[in-house]
Amino acid sequence: PLLKLVRSRIVWLLVLAVSAILTVKVLDSFESVLEQAVVLSLFIPLLTGTGGNTGNQAATTVTRALALGDVRKSDVLQVMWREMRVGMLLGATLGILGFIIASLVYDVHIGIVIGTTLLGICTLSATVGGVMPILAKVVGADPAVFSNPFISTFCDAAGLIIYFFIARAVLGL
């Protein structure tokens, strides 16, 4: 039984470990932005962690609903719409808090970058997190094993892209 559990998990973890290179490539492509505003690097763990947590909460909720029969594969659009709105509200709340703290500790421009990024990351992560268990079920994968690692990997890379595009626009980098 132990090796069977390992086999059921290792394939996805290996695929995702390799795909995590995407996150490294994103950071590499925005190296000049980080060099011009080093303070941005301090917020990376907060932003990627928030994205992963938001997406994983949504995935866990939907995975449970799938297991209980409260959600079916055909409900994907309704789930996507609901989780997008939940993510926006969570992102707005966390974004306001992030804006206030970053503005007080650094400056208002950094606050705008952090607040806006939290809104975008939470919206995207909740949407992806809500849809991923359903897609996993459609392709015959176990949503409980596949969803959370994929969400974390995807949201890290996508969240950093959102972050650096917003930073470039707001800070003029």
Which residues make up each language-model segment?
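Soluble-to-membrane junctions at the N-terminal ends of transmembrane alpha-helices
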Residues: 1-17, 73-92, 111, 115
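Cytosolic regulatory modules rich in charged/polar residues
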Residues: 1-44
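Alpha-helical transmembrane segments and their helix-entry boundary regions
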Residues: 5, 79, 110-111, 144-149, ...
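Residue-level micro-sites within transmembrane alpha helices that shape
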Residues: 8, 52-56, 82, 155-158
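Conserved, well-folded catalytic cores of nucleic-acid-processing
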Residues: 9, 13, 29, 53, ...
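Alpha-helical transmembrane segments in multi-pass membrane proteins
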Residues: 12-20, 43, 47, 51, ...
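Helix-coil boundary and interhelical linker segments in multi-pass alpha-helical membrane proteins
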Residues: 28-39, 103-110, 165-173
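Juxtamembrane helix-loop transition segments at the membrane interface in multi-pass membrane proteins
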Residues: 30-39, 54-79, 129-152, 167
